[in-house]
């Protein structure tokens, strides 16, 4: 049974008129806020960010989709067949709608997938008019997707970009986003006399002002979280700080710990506390509770001073310096290291460099949703061709970094229905403030990228794939992953669109030692932040080395219920089972500089 439908009360036109006048005034204020980046400052100069942020993306989208259209125009017969197919689909839909309007029951011509929440309200199916709108949108969208999929004469990168940009367009123009084509929004607007739009426009104005004229759609209540209290909660101490990172040592909760400490290298594209969201979801806290001395790098949120910090800088001043400081703090020369996402790519680069130079202090490596071979990289590869990278480099040259908002927008575009338009509708049309949610607080806590580092990463990994080809050079050393012989734990997640499971699987073959490939459920974040307990729902698969075809490995792998965290702990323990008395951070050769989570994590983009 669907949601019970009730007839709305008659609209209060006096209230609607009053709210319409107020809405016009708030709209005027919002328009003024959106023009702030274009206002003159001083002697007529434009404020930073005066160029329209989305212009380059719109130009690229237009060029890409035009190339697809041109391939169809070159084959009129095939284009006519496609148009005929679309016409037949709409004829069937119109016939079905007329039949429904005569009181008969008909099967829908097309339906949204069960996971599509946009059309969940009963009126989308019960009301013939809105059902027609919904099915028309779905038919046109699927026809457009098929046009891209079957276009001939375009390379796969262009096709991938076209699919990506088409997904953005279809998400933006969904009838669920607009009052007059969404029955639920229309009902609410009439019942409230437009007060929901008033609240929404006020939030839009606030978000434009907060973004300096650029719209930053709020996803959560940013005032609801405090570091050390609500997020990044595991106790510890900052025991070292340099220009690029703070090194945090976490306080033990067991009397003894594994002798070999663990260094976690998070990505610098976002902040480390995704691994320490709260006591229930903290991978860091859970590893501490198992008796591991955990160290974590907290990267600086860079500014113009860091423009020349490149991949080698992050290796030397990040991972290698952290290992040195761990030795000072604990007396241990050997460490286990774990890298997450691009932090894992940096860890792999460091391992290859150390293998070439005879420095072998990292005795085991764990990679969490990490790519070393970018042949089958995820949707972010859409932004990585020569033209787009040059445009990014030109933009970074202005200030020495890539703005955090641009990187955050790129990640949000990977899931536009969930991470963009659902919040646009909720905030600005329904007029509802988003709820407090720690994961979305972290998602909104953007970081900048130094120009030299980001350019190296885009060109050497996404564009030219030099690490996988044995062509990457760092510190005048050519890197060869086959020389990396340490045991490797390589975690992928089944639904990852950033580091696809296939990409991680094939990257496993690039290492020269034993690799334990593990496939967890869910995606890039939820598949990693998957604590043990009664709520552990995704499970994971193990099957030893990643050999042969990915599909064959999955079919033959053993499926396990629950979290992969205990499996990983056992793997670490097997590498070095010796235990020693627990180490108290800040009491040895390196005194505490600040309590965890430190100062760098608090820097805003």
Swiss-Prot record:
Coiled coil: none
GO BP annotation list: poly(3-hydroxyalkanoate) biosynthetic process; poly-hydroxybutyrate biosynthetic process
GO terms, molecular function: acyltransferase activity
UniProt KW keywords: Acyltransferase, Cytoplasm, PHA biosynthesis, Transferase
Entries under InterPro entries matching the protein: AB_hydrolase_1, AB_hydrolase_fold, PHA/PHB_synthase, PHA_synth_I, PhaC_N
Subcellular location: Cytoplasm
Enzyme class: transferase
Catalytic residues identified in the record: 341
Highest taxon listed in the record's lineage: Bacteria
GO CC annotations on file: cytoplasm
Residue ranges of every copy of the AB hydrolase-1 domain listed in the record: 319-527
Cited PANTHER family: POLY(3-HYDROXYALKANOATE) POLYMERASE SUBUNIT PHAC (PTHR36837), POLY-3-HYDROXYBUTYRATE SYNTHASE (PTHR36837:SF5)
NCBIfam families registered for this protein in UniProt: PHA_synth_I
Protein name: Poly(3-hydroxyalkanoate) polymerase
UniProt organism field: Methylorubrum extorquens
